[in-house]
């Protein structure tokens, strides 16, 4: 049952992140957000989550932040639900 709720919650978050928010209820730069339909960031901002459902609206997401799409990331790449950091990725590959 726990997995069911997790899947439903993931779907809700995904759908809410896909919609273009134009309403007056959206959050502006550096305001609190949750990456849900309840407190979304205004376009083209993205919610940088620090904990579950708690973050700040940013122009783009730095490496390591939770993402759905590559256009949310400053690097332009969202891989496995995280924004990549090209410099850190190169350093990690060289030191492995």
Curated annotation (Swiss-Prot):
Residues 1-23 form the signal peptide. GO terms for cellular component: extracellular region. The keyword Disulfide bond applies. Pfam families: UPF0506. It is found in: Secreted. The keyword Disulfide bond applies. Disulfide bonds join 60-74, 67-78, 73-83. It comes from the Eukaryota. This is Uncharacterized protein SJCHGC09766. It comes from Schistosoma japonicum.
